[in-house]
């Protein structure tokens, strides 16, 4: 069977997304990030009009949120989209390269932890920054529930994002956000027309055994 990607489920719906919540429920390798970079980002650039003529304040912009610094580095590489290795750990050099890349005029990449820090500094300043964006992408959205047991600040990021659902297109993406999906369905804030899913692929591992003695291991190898 030919592998399917989430873009084949969404098709052209993204062109008609209105303000509110979008849920993309799909596993690793389903093309969630690829959809954002190769479909939604070019669409945002197109909708913004000519780069040299358009008012920067009227650009259609995307804020891409993720839960870990290593993932942020991967997303930044994907935004460049040139197949080159960029020095994401060298801020000054990276900043110069980003300024030279058109894509970064339309998309920013943050961690959820940055949202938390900025909110603690000044909720008002953070709101002014977030008001610049049309799309908010919440990658690995299970962070809001999965990390909550050991990170009391997680709810800050979630509340900040939730406040924008009425004024932005907020896209939640994850393979394991069932708790969030159940909550949104219960409170009536997730339309089934805004829910996109791909069945999770079964892994290749059928059985996992642990052997604590060398003899057991040797018998398995010899069998």
Regions found by a protein language model. Give the residues of each.
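Residue-level preference for the first positions of well-ordered beta-strands
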Residues: 19-23, 61-63, 106-107, 135
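Post-Walker A helix-loop "phosphate-sensing" segment adjacent to the P-loop in P-loop NTPases
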Residues: 42-62
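Interdomain hinge/linker at the junction between the two RecA-like core domains of SF2 helicases
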Residues: 179-223
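Conserved interdomain hinge at the start of the Helicase C-terminal
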Residues: 8-17, 23, 35-46, 206-223
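Conserved Walker A/P-loop ATP-binding site and its immediately adjacent core
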Residues: 28, 35, 40, 58-83, ...
